[in-house]
A protein has these predicted regions:
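Catalytic activation segment of kinase domains across protein kinase-like and atypical kinase folds
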Residues: 77-78, 82, 161-166, 170-185
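Phosphate/ATP-binding catalytic cores across multiple sugar-kinase/actin-like superfamilies
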Residues: 148-162
Length: 185
């Protein structure tokens, strides 16, 4: 079927990410917390995708926070209630997403965008760095875009092959493999 991307990682390192650990600079206006219900869904979905050979992040662990103080409106019908808190530890070779490049673009900061691009290429796509020195291609931006677009296409094809439908396809959920399973069908 499909290669078990992103694990194992040929670069030899992995990134960890905590879902539900609390407020961070990236929490936007939310509280940065997660409930058990969505955390179990995240864990099960990522492991199911992996078992089906679909490119995905993996869930390394799932833990309860020990409190019932996370307020969520499960059906968005105005009836929020307290739910048990949880934390999922995700593992992946890379958590940079399409949306990661939106911040420097919104700030109109090309230097920051270039710094992020150089970091991503150096750490996650080193084979593109050598190709970028050709006179006709001074930036690895286009080769990176093409490779990630191809990887994303293969991932979406793998979803379709197993009948998976991701419920939210925004830029913070696009990486070239499956990530963030908070809503799916």
């Amino acid at each position: 079927p499909f290669p078990p991307y992103p694990l194992p990682n040929p670069a030899g390192f992995y990134e960890l990410q905590l879902k539900g650990a609390g407020t961070t600079p990236y929490s936007r206006f939310a509280d940065g917390r997660a409930v058990l219900r969505s955390s179990v869904r995240e864990f099960v979905a990522s492991e199911a995708m992996h078992s089906l050979g679909v490119p995905t992040t993996r869930a390394l662990s799932l833990a309860l926070t020990g409190d019932r103080s996370v307020v969520r409106d499960q059906f968005y019908d105005g009836r929020a209630r307290l739910e048990p808190g949880a934390v999922v530890c995700r593992v992946s070779p890379c958590f940079v997403r399409f949306g990661s490049f939106e911040l420097p673009a919104a700030r109109e900061d090309p230097a920051l965008a270039r710094k992020l691009l150089d970091f991503v290429v150096e750490k996650h796509y080193p084979h593109l760095a050598a190709a970028s020195f050709a006179p006709s291609n001074r930036s690895p931006g286009l080769p990176l875009l093409l490779e990630v677009a191809e990887r994303t296409g293969r991932t979406v094809a793998a979803w379709q092959a197993c009948g998976f439908v991701h419920g939210v396809l925004n830029t913070v959920r696009r990486t070239g493999f499956s990530v963030r399973f908070s809503i799916f069908f």
